[in-house]
Curated annotation (Swiss-Prot):
PANTHER family: AEL197CP (PTHR39142:SF1), MID1P (PTHR39142)
Name of the gene encoding the protein in the UniProt record: yam8
Pfam families: Mid1
Natural source organism: Schizosaccharomyces pombe (strain 972 / ATCC 24843) (Fission yeast)
Stretches in topological domain Cytoplasmic: 486
Lineage: Eukaryota, Fungi, Dikarya, Ascomycota, Taphrinomycotina
GO BP terms in the entry: calcium ion import across plasma membrane
Stretches of the chain found on the membrane's Extracellular side: 25-464
Protein name, UniProt field: Stretch-activated cation channel yam8
Amino acid sequence: MFFFSTHLILKILFFWSITRNIFGATYTSLLLNNTINGNINDQSTAYYNLTWEGNTAYNVSLTLSTCTAFDGANDLMLYISNNTFDEALPLDNFTITASENGLATIFVTGYSPLYIAVSSAFSQFAPNFFVESGESTLEGNNVINYELAAGIDTPFSQYNATKFLFAQDTDFQAALLITGNLTTNETSIIPSYEIYVNPSNSTYDNTFNKFSSSFCAFQNNPSTVNTNNADRSMTLRGLGPFAKEQFYLKGLDPNVTYTAYLVEPNIGQPGGTVYPGVTFTTKTSPACQLIYDLQFCSEVAYAVPGNSSLFSASALAEWYDQQAYGYYQNFTYTLDLIPCNATSWSAYSLLKNCSDCANSYKNWLCASVIPRCADINDNSSYLIYKNYDSRYPLIDEVIQPGPYKEVLPCSYLCYSLASSCPLDLGFACPKAGYGLEFSYGEVSNVTGLITCNAPGVEFYESGSALLNISWRTFFISLIFWILFVE
């Protein structure tokens, strides 16, 4: 029994596919630090010679990106040699790579000229080896469009496997996506990122999924929603010291799962970087509306009890923010009566001060007055059904959202508040088994699952990292509570 490596099979297929016309092949010129667009029929090979001036060896990064293709087409193959292929084949003097998800990359150090071949022979329509050369098994417009690029050191097009686009939350017609931390805290300049969004498993999405590593595929194929349909802005919200770009997507359909891809075009040259896709599902009920960029409760970026027939998203955000700020302002008047600048002997705590108290109160207040809203048909055990009995009564009187389910505030917010503020203010938390479960939720250790609400809780944070932060705060607060409050 004989076993053949994929590399050997590619060589055999390449040898078979080009020997029929190798000696009469025409080589198209490709200059270093340039790109060229090409079209190739199924079962065909295209040839290029890469040249540059001088007798200098360069580290050449060669990329082949599939831009558009016919249904059923497999990925292309890329070959490079320092000999013409009629000379290279007998000497086995060439390098091969097969495209993966629409992108093939070869790094090679060499002198001018280098010889390149792009082949479509390795596809599901490849004829039997005993079929007459040049005979095709499929009729029709079997054309693949591609981009071939040759750069120095750094490839023109590349795929970055690090996840960099995250879904924060959705409502029944919108979604909020956010990038990871950028390299600056500058928020006045919006970077050049682009997004492409389609219903998962749709025709458009299947195309992007097949060529999910190819930059030109995103720019050459249609998309249901893209950067032109999104409200783009910058934010400092969330973890990390740097700015992030956020995309507010409108006009989505209820109860639909979407896949979004983030790409970053190069500045000053063709090509760009593609990042992994992210999926999200819009809510079913219009009782939840997505709000973000609040002035006071600035970490709020999630769906809240709403009513789109009475409030736009921006008006709803302003109403909630004003409610929270009004309570906070009154609280500061009371806190001003506390001798915050007292000596350590007369201070209310050796561990906490009035700034800690104010910050803990703000975090607790924003999560309590601005509930996180979930679909009425979501049967998750950590959700609480609300029907004209919202934790903040004015929600039912003014917003009138109708029935919805709430993600309760995290219990550690209450413990932090009680342990950070003077006892004279009277903050107390319900005990487990005596009302805590009906007022507060607990942090989950499942990645991406938000089982309780707190400022800054994000879908993209790993459950373990969030759990560590939350339980550290919880532990310190609980010890204080046991020693000094109960």
